[in-house]
């Protein structure tokens, strides 16, 4: 290389060292990135690869979670919502996590409550005693109910206001939380709930209600009800715990549906034999 050219290069290098703006502009003209920029691009790319790998793992987990789910037409939507739920959990976006989780519960519940068989069963059985007999010599059966008890299925599952009108209406007209409680009773407990099952029923339905109350906590413009505000104020300070509690509630709910689905036929046959009570 000629000495003049080498001298010019040396001058340019000195200018770059002395003047950061000149250095930056020269790099732009030559399409050269700094080592710091290279590092940032590298980190961003690594994060993208990491997130992609995580998404693949989570999608496989979601597909396994919904493996064997009886309503196959819902599985693709449920898997997508599950993946969104886990994405928001990684980002510690609790409100969005609750919404994505609740959308899975809502999808399943609304589908079941539009099922003519479940609607028929509920209308005929609302007036039946809520619990079956658990005597020593009596087998646990949907037919062996505590008929001396005035505590009906409707009294257990539905909220107290307008309970008679609700029991005569379709399941689709119930409130969101009443629909969930209905599904848990008829599929989760296969309409064969014992007195000793009350606490577990209360625990799962309370958690599912908490998820419902927290689902809109991040939505702008949506005014929280008094019940939603109380639930959020109770839950949010302990959100690290409730991530796990809510995931546990979703797991139990879905497992109950998987197990209870095959019992719908037997429950319907029992409902056909009885005289509906109000």
Task: Show which residues each predicted segment covers.
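Residue-level detector of alpha-helical secondary structure
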Residues: 2-17, 23, 27-34, 50, ...
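Intrinsic-disorder-associated interaction segments
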Residues: 2-5, 15, 19, 23, ...
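Alpha-helical structural motif
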Residues: 8, 74-77, 81, 179, ...
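Charged alpha-helical initiation segments
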Residues: 10-95
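Intrinsically disordered or highly flexible coil/loop and linker segments, enriched in small
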Residues: 22, 94, 110, 114, ...
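A structural signal for well-ordered alpha-helices, especially hydrophobic packing surfaces
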Residues: 37, 82-89, 108-112, 212-222, ...
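Amphipathic alpha-helical interface elements
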Residues: 66-185, 270
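Charge-enriched, short contiguous segments at helix-coil
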Residues: 182-278
